[in-house]
């Protein structure tokens, strides 16, 4: 697998991890082709062919056992440390992967994939400080168009609290000047995803200072304040965003959420209608509409909204739970018990995965 595709797969995995705010945009993996990198091609070694076939079949332990056997038969067998490191990486044993990839790099410092896998092993093993030097090398090999290496490196900088370098990495990722308002905005969003709320707020405020009319900056601040239950401040920021960006469906949704928390249900309903008119593909506004209509005593309409959300995403436990409550209010006890049971089962599965 090429250097860029290893990183793309990792970003795809990262993007599926639950984040602080469900509506935060998710970064997709790069769709560009394999990058040209300053790496030394690894010739196929027939000694490793069987182990590689086992790895492709997902038989990691068997492959690793065979590689260890080869190593014991010939302690000087070239490339065996690299193969063991890659095998442990695929298995998800990142500590052992790093243990074997380090001597592999000493054996061949120009092996770009081994350098990359060592950096990723440290990162995924929870050692971002150790990962950074190797990921920095990878970042210099990849072309400017490939954003994935910059993303992973930026996250490592955040985790080690080196925020200026994180900002530079994300600036490169989005191809904007590192001192621009956009750079601060992008970094604030990434900080929020990593649950660094105070620094995220600081960077978002800096973005506003540099460019008060930059779209989505006030939206991000509104999300921050909403999360911190600073409802008046959140409402103010969302209103500012709408004055600059009146076609942004998510801002209507978030502003409606803020109004619902202070029991301004008519205002919330009106804003949710606008959000749905602009974007009928998101379940969040339909779910919140169900809650708002139920609070207004319009339970039958609430059921319709929740049924629509359920048709779009049948595996959301919250929707099943709210629908069960609404059915119970209407006296539809059998339907209520069914939905509450399904919601409980789905929630249990989610908790087990976490």
What would you call each of these model-derived segments?
Residues 27-35, 318-354:
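Terminal, low-structured helical/coil segments at or just beyond the last alpha-helical repeat
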Residues 43-76, 86, 90, 155, ...:
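Alpha-helical segment of the N-proximal tetratricopeptide repeat
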Residues 44, 78-79, 112-113, 145-148, ...:
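Helix-start (N-cap) detector for alpha-helical repeat units in TPR-like alpha-solenoids
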Residues 57-65, 90-103, 125-137, 160-172, ...:
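Structural signature of tandem alpha-helical TPR/SEL1-like repeats
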Residues 73, 107, 140-142, 175-176, ...:
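Structural marker of alpha-solenoid helical repeat scaffolds
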Residues 83, 117, 151-152, 186, ...:
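Canonical tetratricopeptide repeat
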